[in-house]
Swiss-Prot record:
Protein's name according to its UniProt entry: UPF0303 protein mlr5144
Superkingdom of this protein's organism: Bacteria
Xref: SUPFAM superfamilies: GlcG-like (SSF143744)
Family of the protein in this entry: Belongs to the UPF0303 family.
Gene3D superfamilies: Haem-degrading domain
Amino acid sequence: MAVADDIALIRKQEEVLVFPAFDEAVAFKIGSAIRARAIAENLPIIVDIRLWDRPLFYAAMPGSNASNPDWARRKINVVRRFLRSTYRMVLEQQRPDRAFKIGEGLDVSDYVLAGGGFPVTVKGAGVIGVIAVSGLPEREDHGVVIDALCDHLGIDKRGLVLASEAE
């Protein structure tokens, strides 16, 4: 799939994966589903779900490491700043160094171009938070979030899931 096609599909994900409401219980349910998948598939990830003012869910799986929370924090900052998926930002920016252009004024210690951060959007309210996964290749981090959101919202994944890079 071409980069432009992936960007278009991620935009569609951002438009479709919208919550009617989002609170601690919803965050726990989604976080727990991601954690259960990680256990079942031995995924060495961390998951961090938060509103802008506070964390709601966090889990670190065996095999994750000390750098994963920092990667997640920097992904969270990108979603907060740009109100869009970090993987979409990766594809739009096409920067091999994973840093934003100097003119953006974004410190590499606080912002990173890496997939796995996805906005929590509530109908009528807009983007209120973020779900971040770190520990897998960025396209897979992104996919873990998308799968969980589709499952939670009861949305058919067909037509929303990115093809694997091998395809």
